Amino acid sequence: MFSAAGAVARWIAPFLTVAAVAGMWFLADPVQVGPAPAVRLADDANPLAGMPFYVNPNSAAMRAAQHADPPSAELAAIANTPQAYWIVPGSSAGTVAKYTGDAQAAGAIPLLAIYGIPHRDCGSFAAGGLATADDYRGWIDGIASGVGATRTAIILEPDALAMADCLSADQRQERYDLIRYAVDTLTRNPATAVYVDGGHLRWHSAEDMAARLNKVDVARARGFSLNTANFFTTADEIGYGEAISGLTNGSHYVIDTSRNGVGPAPDSGLNWCNPGGRALGTPPTAATAGAHADAYLWIKRPGESDGTCDKGDPPAGTFVSQYAIDLAHAAG
């Protein structure tokens, strides 16, 4: 049976130190895998180790926890767990600079998820993105300027490579070019660890995804991210990640464990869209079981809707307190 007191002990305890530091309480045809560059530009030392991850004191989860009546141990635990700050069109260089600067002042690593590629989400529940390639390049320039020399982790364009098949040939090439541009621009700050999103193991074969990652010069980044906003188990994603790593000159990777505590929902058309019965996964940590896994992270923010899901759910990105509480309950 779920115990609210137990939930706090299990979920918030690992991050009291973070909060204190931050000054807060609160398969298809065979694929030809393109060659990866022989020399990695990123230092092999884990850039996510040795410092806590930043807790956003102004997140939707934090606001919900602060205003919960009666108080919710589950919401407090989730709010005080480090999660990604999503950068979408409209976010300014000043916004990025303030967020990363606040994290730096707190002695913590900020985690950003950049989500603004043209034709984003192929017109699905999180459709949007910048209108043109030039707009996107200028936006990336602004983000890089905002990050500056701050030690930062970046998840670059969730789903963009995995979803590229929905595009025309010209649009697909433009997408590869834009992600490559973002990798090159963001990694000019040697303290920025960039992870290009690589989908998950049920979407593309390791060979296919490695080929896509090599096309965007993943070897110039720290590596790639897996399972973003999805539910596949950490063990399964480690197997997938190690296979991709072997095809991308030893790239490192991170895994989104925010909602994978009991794995995915049974197969169905929209089993990824606000499925019931899912659970919080391992809290963020750089202590992993994968040889090339830098960290388990909460990239998706637990409690935020995946979209309307063709059933009248709240729009994508809307924080729903009961959904967050249900994820905590399912985690036990």
Regions from the language model: what does each represent?
Residues M1-T17:
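N-terminal export and membrane-targeting signals
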Residues G6, V21-A45:
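C-terminal region of N-terminal signal peptides and the immediate post-cleavage residues
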Residues N46-G146, R301-L327:
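N-terminal carbohydrate-binding/catalytic regions of secreted carbohydrate-active enzymes
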Residues N56-A79, G199-Q322:
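Surface-exposed substrate-engagement region within the catalytic domains
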Residues A93-T100, Q104, R137-A144, Y176-V183, ...:
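Extracytoplasmic/secreted envelope proteins and their assembly/folding machinery
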Residues G101-A105, Y115, A144-G148, V183-A191, ...:
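Sec-exported extracytoplasmic/periplasmic mature domains
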Residues G107-L111, R151-I155, A191-Y195, A221-S225, ...:
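Structural preference for beta-strand elements that scaffold enzyme active sites
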Residues G129-A149, P158-T192, H200, A206:
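Active-site cleft segment of glycoside hydrolase catalytic domains centered on the general acid/base Glu
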